[in-house]
Amino acid sequence: MLNIIHRLKSGMFPALFFLTSASVLAHPLTIPPGHWLEGMAVGVTELSGTLYVRDVSWQWQPRAVRMSSPDAVQAGLAAGKGGMVSESRRGQDFYILGGHTTSLTTARSGLQPSVTLLQVAPSSPRIAARGELARGQVRYGEITFTLRHLLAWQDNITGGQGWSVVSGEVTPEAEKQVKRQLWQVNGYEWTPDYAGLTARPDAFISGAESLLSQENGSQHIAGAWVTSLSDVRVNFPGAEEPVKRWQGNLTPVVVYF
């Protein structure tokens, strides 16, 4: 499951956001002795849905990751000395998040996005894995992975050449993902290929006057973002019984500058 949280850095202008998936978990309540609810059944409530906000600057599309047999070195979990392990194939990328500007727009504060994963350290990305055994018992392990982000930028001056990189690494598959996002930008009719260029780090924030001369007229820009995982490794240390299936949750946090 992927949930998206949108935040603004302090001092930044308000930024509208688009939340493609929302899930709220209400944990069981602790009822103090003597309270009128004491003894009553209190369970877990799950709320999910899609929230739409008008006039948004960016739209985000989370995607669930499911490791199937062709994606893994070995189908399922393999038992070893250290427990049960499953690893993705070398060079296999899983794209978990895509984003693009809703339409052609202009550079301004509050437009440039940055994505982090909640409770995931960039230096050593790992999350908890919840595994189910054959008879329904639950045991926990961990999932480690390599995390990559790519932010692409393009304007009407470079529209015929292709898009430029603001941050991240471009691979052939990442280029396809960026192209897929750019084609969803309203009004986009430029070349969606990688131009081999690097844009300035604040390309979405800088005003048009710093990039264009007066005779060139106004500036129109488009942007795309992709987040991917690779080197995925699922590990259940010391698992005596085979783990039949497992699940991990990621929460991307989108911050606008």
Swiss-Prot record:
Highest rank taxon of the organism: Bacteria
Subcellular location per the Swiss-Prot or TrEMBL entry: Fimbrium
Signal peptide: 1-26
GO cellular component: pilus
Keyword list, A-Z: Fimbrium, Plasmid, Signal
Purpose: K88 minor fimbrial subunit, plays an essential role in the biogenesis of the K88 fimbriae. Fimbriae (also called pili), are polar filaments radiating from the surface of the bacterium to a length of 0.5-1.5 micrometers and numbering 100-300 per cell. They enable bacteria to colonize the epithelium of specific host organs.
UniProt name for this protein: K88 minor fimbrial subunit FaeJ
Organism: Escherichia coli
